[in-house]
């Protein structure tokens, strides 16, 4: 069995892998960091097209971490790398919002900073609304990031690279405002990752060696104080390299996007029927909130206490009308929709179910999450 590595050694290996070994996303050995995301709205595609090619080519994320309703928000991007997602978000939050990117790899931070003036000029902003910091995502206080200072934290295939996941999530909880959200894509394992996989430098750099057992996410989130994780999308990860495939054995991996909300400590919310008013840009007809709930404009949907609390206490509150479920007519046969609805929380099940629905031959240009040019 390979000897385990300490945290400092892992950090140095990750810095070397992303700062020196990888030059473009084409150098990746697995599809862990280029898996598909959910369909991208046109306004986000347009924002992606405004990002400089040099920045996009150094992007190694595992999805597209752009949540909804971003105008005027303060957003923190953990492991911002070359700054691709930051520059997309910069356009979406607008001049009154702000985006901060933090990354431990100085080479990547310098790439992001190099193109700051270019992007602000392209977006037509009088003053920069993006800041890039060099630091560790599990030590945000050391980088000067204040408590309860952000509406949203995003992370794109990065938390798995850090040995202490709980410390990362604890710091995220600290810097989020009440009602704030961590919206993040990451890699998860089907079982506790064996030591020989954890000790493999390439597999760790490829986001597999440090992957969290998917069931542990809910345990850590509850311990810290987050609401239960809400699964959004999931895709099975494939490994084309035979040597790496042999090391992985029976351990399977999935790229998944989750939402974690930090809510104020108030009395539990009641079950409700909610009606979406269609007020969110790019999602006027329907809001796909997660794998379990899609809200169509003007249509009443029964939600559980947890979902009601999230919608009422987050930035989404103005977009919904809430009615206590008892005030509505009972569902047929005396059972409510909530009693018959089975919530999907297992990313492997969601990925497998999604694969069954996909065409056998994908259309040209849909490789990875963003097609051949990684520009969605």
UniProtKB/Swiss-Prot annotation:
Catalyzes the transfer of a methyl group from AdoMet to trivalent arsenicals producing methylated and dimethylated arsenicals. It methylates arsenite to form methylarsonate, Me-AsO(3)H(2), which is reduced by methylarsonate reductase to methylarsonite, Me-As(OH)2. Methylarsonite is also a substrate and it is converted into the much less toxic compound dimethylarsinate (cacodylate), Me(2)As(O)-OH. It catalyses: arsenic triglutathione + [thioredoxin]-dithiol + S-adenosyl-L-methionine + 2 H2O = methylarsonous acid + [thioredoxin]-disulfide + 3 glutathione + S-adenosyl-L-homocysteine + H(+); arsenic triglutathione + 2 [thioredoxin]-dithiol + 2 S-adenosyl-L-methionine + H2O = dimethylarsinous acid + 2 [thioredoxin]-disulfide + 3 glutathione + 2 S-adenosyl-L-homocysteine + 2 H(+); arsenic triglutathione + 3 [thioredoxin]-dithiol + 3 S-adenosyl-L-methionine = trimethylarsine + 3 [thioredoxin]-disulfide + 3 glutathione + 3 S-adenosyl-L-homocysteine + 3 H(+). Its EC number is 2.1.1.137. Keywords: Cytoplasm, Methyltransferase, Phosphoprotein, S-adenosyl-L-methionine, Transferase. PANTHER family: ARSENITE METHYLTRANSFERASE. GO terms for biological process: arsonoacetate metabolic process; methylation; response to arsenic-containing substance; toxin metabolic process. This is Arsenite methyltransferase. It is found in: Cytoplasm, Cytosol. InterPro entries: Arsenite_MeTrfase-like, Methyltranfer_dom, SAM-dependent_MTases_sf. It comes from the Eukaryota. The modification Phosphoserine is found at residues 47, 336. It is an enzyme of class 2 (transferase). Belongs to the methyltransferase superfamily. Arsenite methyltransferase family. Pfam families: Methyltransf_31. It comes from Mus musculus. Residues 354-363 have a biased composition (Basic and acidic residues). Residues 354-376 are annotated as: Disordered. GO terms for cellular component: cytosol; mitochondrion. One of its GO terms (molecular function) is arsenite methyltransferase activity.
